[in-house]
Amino acid sequence: MSETVSLHKLVKKAVHSKLSFKTFLGLFSQLNTKQVVQDGEYQTEILEIVQNPRNLNDKKITEYKVVLAIQLSLSSSEELKRFWGNLSKISLVGQVDYLIRLNKILKYEYSKYDKDIVRLLIKVQYCDYIVEVLDSFGDKKLSTEQKSLANHIVFFASSVIEHVVVKDEALVNDLVFQLATRLEGLRLSNLLDFLLLKSKNILSEDQIRLTDSSGSGEDKSSDLPTITTSLYKNLSVGSLSSAKQETYNETIKFLWLNKIMKSWKFADNESIFNNFVHNFIPSSDKNKNPYLTSFELIKATFKGFGYAVINNDDCYVLFNWKNFIITRIPVILSTLKFANVNDEETLERAVLNAFNSLPDSIVKVLTNLASGSTKVYDLRQIFIKSLIFNRLLPPVAFQKFFPMESKITQQVILSELAQYNHDLNLRRKFNDKLINVNSEFTSLEESGLLELCNSLPASLEYSYSRQIELSNAINDIIDEMKISREHEKLNRLLLSVMSNVQLTNILVFNSNPYVVLGKMIDYIDSENFRIDDDDENFQDVYSYCGVLILSIISIIEKFKIDLSTFNIKNSFALDYINNFYYRLCDDLTNQIPVNSDEEDNTIATNYNNLLIDWINALFDDSNDGLSDDLIKSISIKQIYKLIPLVYQQAITATSIGKIDFSILTNGIDYLSQVFLIPTTVSIINWLLSEISNKKTDAESLPVKVLSEIVKSNISSESGSQELSSLVFKIVVNICGSNILIALKKIKDWENSQRIRDVVSIVTANLDSNYVEKDLSLPESKSDININEQIKSHLVNFQQQADSPTPIHAFIHRFISDSKDQVLRVLLQEVTSYQKQNNEATKIFINLASYLVVSSSIDSVEDKKYWHGYLSNVSSSATEHKILKNSDKEFNSSMDYHYSSIFNDASSGASNDDDLFNDKSSKQLSSGKLLEQLRTKVNRYNNLLAKFNVIFAENQDPSSPWHKTVNTLADKLLDDINDLYI
């Protein structure tokens, strides 16, 4: 070993390279032979660890060092003595970390180690450590850190007793006796009682009498887990006043139904209805006639929809509520058997009474719903028509409900009923207008496919069976196209469907967006879209790839699907979404790593040369523009990664005066070419981030560039105007709401003709039912107490509907998007309730606890899992802490260089141990992997999982949160038991 090697360098290398223990032991032995490691150096370099690691990387280093030190200590008697002799010299918190890890090793891995070493640890070294540490505490009042260390010393000893590591009672007897006498001296009576309970079969009666003491213990309540049963029972729903119980029941109905609307759980009507009945209908009423269940279901869904509208829920959520009411509720009601004995308990009466029970604030919402920019409708009328069309009510019933409605007569109802009963045969229509069409001679417009798709939302509005037929037809066609590789026909289908957001919503409502996403991700990942060198239509083929990308992004954007935690190896689609849509290339750099090799430098040089060629072609007037050879020089997937980088750099160059704006606009004109239009999604989103993050005005460069992109695509007069307009319409569907929000935040935007033009163009091309509102917190309200607002919002949920404010909508969205904060507030309120019994606090705890449970459990398997997990109070949840990309420290490597566009694989080696990076991608398709990873996300990245981490971290009785988390664990377990699924 080189003379320059020190323990510091050895440990640093071990941590950086993640050396195996065997390798480290060999190197350490060599070092120790040449120069004996001194105690001070051992403590500093081996034992001392980072407290409260700031990020995931620091935490991994800390865990690695702890395990390394323990493994080293168990390698020989000399190292064991060195470890225990020095452990007491480091911080008390550090000692606790080592005892926790040793405890786990003792429970699950002790058989791996030499029995004589383990005997020596228990009989000599641990006993000596106990004597040294506990005797050093003296007679003063113990600090929190000292109590914590004493707790873990006892917990480690109890593990020795429970697992009878060496099956030698005499050996364990000595350990227990030494520890018990010192606990008595420190007046830690709860810990002493705990130890004696664990060791009652080991100590003699004389020893127990000698150590048994009922003297006053110091802070007795904080030394061991406190029984929280009485407090937990006082928190139950049954302890609420009758008025508060009614508030609780009405609110959780909304939370339960709204979760269905957000999570696409529409597949099983019978299951939805059964769950509703078991969760919300009193058990004594469940076997009565169906009048009550019909009344409660109709009332709950209409009130829920009204609350969602009042709180400005996402546009797709509002559509899902409406579609569920119109198409699913009639199907559910059709399964009920109304006995025509009592005229007061008919379906008609149930509907009427449900309508009459709705608050005025909800009725006001239901009667003034907008469809499109001008049409106003009453959802109650639409629902009655659906009941008539589904033969649950006679046509004359409409006038009974709405006698003052003159436009919708019985003749109108009968006419619409006849149309409803007409057989659409959607698969045959798609065959006629897509499958059997010769694309070489018939354009998309001439085929009638666009016209068909645009007519379908109205044709399918009332029909559950037709919507299912549509979803099955489209999904089947996508599967068939993947097999036959008919890119052009799939392109036509996607253009026709994705340019109509309402039709897309119907599709994903009835087949789940993840199913559709999986099919499209599979398609694009398995296809390279290569063309022959002499293919003159190669730009068309390239555009097919772009439309697939836009379709995927359109679904995740419009339906708020977060794929940022998913990482599938070799998936171009997920790599593109994460790096070029979510992150907008922000995690890429032009810096070459210091440790780069010759191959890395060659790759970077090739990238720079390619970038220069494209910049010259796009922005240099002296060139002939984009040549076919340049376009074909790289794959279309690489082009879609390169173009956003090119334009970001060109815009940056313009902002610092390196190129003129006129030159930039010449390059922007190329973005109206059909195969390049899909790249504008990333460019526009990047521009919007520039507008939002920097103080901009109407004359700022990002606003000007955005205006040029929008105008050049909308006003294009090329031969493919129809096609390019459809492609850009999908872009507008994706970015349009964000464009309007960002531009309207600019001061005096109304005075800018440029901004008004963009707003007008975008608005004209957006479906008005899918324009998201700006729900950011008003600047005048930026100082509000978020925690208090969360509490108030849940407790006063129904009352707020009478006088809604922007803050209510903001908090409603905040709770939906930031459930972690709800958990933090819940913990604070449970702590507060222990000190002051408050009715408002109690109902909030019940509502927030229900929200935690209901948002985390999607299936019977989930319920069994979490019931079992929380039932075992000693379980640790730290292993389930989700690893997100945002938690990772940035590592400088070629994977983060701009030249990574040459890589079709999405993940480098640095991501291989990510929880959601599945290594079986070679065996399974991206779509199948996506479904598997989504299951993992749902299980390990929910509020119960997050609480479980907090619970495990606060099992130390000295923790200020100890009593709180145990009380809340009981409450959550009770709510899990009560949840029927």
From Swiss-Prot:
Transmembrane segments: none
Pfam families to which the protein is assigned, alphabetical: Med5
Single GO MF annotation: transcription coregulator activity
Predominant subcellular localization, coarse grouping: nucleus
Subcellular location: Nucleus
One GO CC annotation: mediator complex
Record GO biological process: regulation of transcription by RNA polymerase II
Assembly: Component of the Mediator complex.
Function: Component of the Mediator complex, a coactivator involved in the regulated transcription of nearly all RNA polymerase II-dependent genes. Mediator functions as a bridge to convey information from gene-specific regulatory proteins to the basal RNA polymerase II transcription machinery. Mediator is recruited to promoters by direct interactions with regulatory proteins and serves as a scaffold for the assembly of a functional preinitiation complex with RNA polymerase II and the general transcription factors.
Family note: Belongs to the Mediator complex subunit 5 family.
The protein's name in its UniProt record: Mediator of RNA polymerase II transcription subunit 5
Annotated organism of origin: Scheffersomyces stipitis (strain ATCC 58785 / CBS 6054 / NBRC 10063 / NRRL Y-11545)
